Amino acid sequence: MNLKLISCEIFYREMCAAVAHSPHRVDITFLPKGLHDLPPGQMPVKMQEAIDAVDGTYDAILLGYGLCNNGLAGVRARNCPLILPRAHDCITLFLGGRDRYREYFDTHPGTYFLTSGWLERGETSGDLAELSVQAQLGMNLTLQEMVEQYGEDNAEYLYETLCQGTRNYSHFAWIPMGVEPPGMEQTARQKAGERGWSFETVPGDMTLIRKLVNGGWNEKEFLTVPPGSAVKAAYDGSIVAGIQ
């Protein structure tokens, strides 16, 4: 098959490694991680633009995304089917499936996950940084910048309320996928040490990523959206569904 993969850059190393061994021809377009930080409704617009830019020579378009806080809701297939994993977010793909992610999530509250993509590409930059919810709410300001704008008392309250997005976390889970350069785990450990958080290595699983680029998409793990139909959120455990 001739496939097109549109993926979040958070999967850069993993998708490249999987595509290198795919039995199919797979052309890749990576989109910036910062799409997740846009105001509600804007990520689907950017995703649709990327899909509409694909020419009609492909048998299917693969989406290297989870539902991502409804970031794919409303996205429509045009000339060929869309294939996407049944996943709320990217951690499902890094851990190989929904069941393993749910098991870990339920037993390890307050966990912040790290992979090579987050360490290398986790910061939103460029035009997307200016458009992000964080920038529009002032969540990207330092405490000193807030003091200068709002006064000391107001600044401390706003900083605690808006800018401490990790205050409910206390644990780093490093997910090695077998594609990282030497020393990256040590970088992750250093980040945990800087925050005084606990640290754990949770082995990653490339199974779902490989299935995405290898074809043979089973209905339990993947949604196939035929031309003319769109993606919608599902609330019956299937996570995503198709709609005319």
Locations of regions flagged by a protein language model:
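Gly/Ser/Thr-rich loops at beta-strand to alpha-helix junctions
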Residues: I6-R13, L62-A73, H88-C90, W118-R121, ...
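N-terminal basic/disordered segments at the start of proteins
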Residues: M1-S22
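Glycine-rich, highly charged phosphate/nucleotide-binding loops
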Residues: G41-A53
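Extended, basic/helix-rich recognition subdomains
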Residues: E152-Q244
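A short beta-strand-loop structural module common to alpha/beta enzyme folds
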Residues: R25-G41, T201-P203
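N-terminal glycine-rich phosphate/adenylate-binding segment common to multiple enzyme folds
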Residues: A50-Y101
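Extended, charge-rich low-complexity interaction segments
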Residues: V54-A73, F113-A129, L223-Q244
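Long, charge-dense
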Residues: C80-L128
